[in-house]
Regions:
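Hydrophobic alpha-helical transmembrane bundles that constitute the permease/transmembrane domains
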Residues: 1, 33-37, 69-85, 113-117, ...
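Junction motif at the cytosolic side of a transmembrane helix
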Residues: 9, 180, 188-219
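Transmembrane helix-boundary elements of multi-pass transport/secretion proteins
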Residues: 1-36
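Hydrophobic alpha-helical transmembrane segments of multi-pass membrane transport proteins
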Residues: 22-83
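Hydrophobic alpha-helical transmembrane segments
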Residues: 22-26, 81, 101-109, 138, ...
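Secretory targeting signals
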Residues: 77-106
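Transmembrane helix segments
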Residues: 127-179
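A structural motif at transmembrane helix-loop-helix junctions in multipass membrane proteins
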Residues: 105-144, 150-151, 213-216
């Protein structure tokens, strides 16, 4: 019933309350670009753990966490540039929308850092939980639900919207276009992004120390 109701209302007014169909399509586009540019760091680390390569990599003097994040960004940035050059001009021509490109790029970088740090934590957790596919599945679903990819956040109950916008999943997919188009406070989003990056970095460093300690104990 809901899809047909939405279609009927959109056909007459183009809006449902504060919901803008054009913006919703842009949110899905940017979210999908961010998702497709993800290197799937969790799966790569999981393979390292299962093959034992992680032991060799941990012996490298380079910080494991920073090396993984730098490598992920090295893949993400060129991929994002290619996708953006191909798709954004086409969609902008068909569905023009006002947004700040510099702000979009800044929060895209923040989103990439948060997304890769989450993937890093999931991958490293496989050192302690051999079958952690369930964790990855749940996080992936939360990322899509709170990242504006399933149901537009604006159509959710207000209390769910408030919760969604405080999560790292929102910051990883939906925040860049929301902030760039002025639908969410840039100052608030930047603060959230910095806090999440620092928190996730701390968790990754703590988990890395636990892995090293376990390796020493087990020889």
């Amino acid at each position: 019933v809901l899809p047909f109701s939405v279609f009927e209302i959109l056909r007459r007014t183009g809006k449902i309350s504060d919901f803008d169909a054009t913006f919703a399509l842009w949110a899905v586009l940017i979210g999908q670009i961010l998702h497709n540019c993800d290197i799937r760091l969790s799966k790569r680390i999981k393979q390292e753990v299962r093959s034992g390569d992680i032991v060799i990599r941990l012996m490298d003097p380079t910080n494991y966490v920073l090396a993984k994040i730098a490598g992920s960004l090295g893949f993400f940035l060129p991929s994002f540039a290619v996708y953006s050059i191909i798709f954004i001009p086409i969609v902008y021509f068909l569905l023009p929308i006002k947004f700040n490109l510099i702000v979009l790029l800044l929060f895209t970088l923040i989103a990439a850092l948060i997304s890769n740090l989450i993937g890093l934590l999931i991958g490293m957790s496989s050192f302690f939980i051999e079958e952690n596919d369930g964790i990855e599945l749940v996080v992936g679903k939360l990322m899509f639900i709170f990242g504006n990819q399933v149901i537009p956040i604006i159509l959710m109950p207000v209390w769910v919207q408030n919760i969604a916008r405080t999560t790292p999943f929102y910051m990883a997919l939906s925040a860049p276009i929301d902030v760039a188009s002025g639908k969410y406070s840039s100052l608030l989003a930047f603060g959230q992004g910095v806090i999440y990056i620092l928190l996730l970095l701390w968790l990754a460093s703590w988990m890395l120390n636990q892995i090293k300690r376990k390796l020493v104990i087990n020889g």
